[in-house]
């Protein structure tokens, strides 16, 4: 599922949160939005997955206006992983991941063998199979995050939105999660905090400040001493490795 945002504006009262943001994710790319807190990154994602309605502008999914795409169709093809995953009810790990199959089932239809296989495969990929009978409330923050990623994988999405998904994870699982997502080969739009992780895994990067995109491009073009100065107000020196890893020294 391709997504295109065109001139998105969003305000809370007199405060402008998004000011004419435009971007597109297509071709199975992993794209990342970077920027300081309050720059509008998460707000932009929320307009795409319909938690917030923009004041103006257009959001297109596969060329169709967001208003013309049903919630059920969106739920089949778009998955979301956020940094805060509090549930109002307690279920086992396996039950939570199985919820991903709900949009693919008709009313009162039972889960098929394929549904169960997809859930098991997703749990295997995030290393949570041995805890599938545990209750979600008993898990650590990092384990909960891996369960939510498994749920997204079991959904078989064509578009994956990630809002700071690695915040609660140890570095080992941060690397594993982003590598796993990258290998899916689907459209991904992620908000990340770690600039070096973003450079390593992203095909394209946007840098936001004050509700606007101020720099964009492939990692080497987007992440420069000049753009980091403009966005984060820091001086830096950047060295790039052959495998697209950015070694950033702050001065």
Regions of interest found by a model, annotated:
Residues 57-65, 74, 134:
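Conserved ABC transporter NBD signature motif
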Residues 154-158:
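A short, proline-enriched helix->beta-strand linker immediately N-terminal to the Walker B motif
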Residues 110, 135-139, 143:
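Conserved ABC ATPase signature
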Residues 49:
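Helix-to-loop junction immediately C-terminal to a conserved catalytic motif
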Residues 98, 113-131:
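Conserved ABC ATPase "signature" region
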Residues 160-164:
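Catalytic Walker B motif of ABC-type/P-loop ATPase nucleotide-binding domains
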Residues 3-5, 17-20:
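Conserved structural motif at the start of ABC-family nucleotide-binding domains
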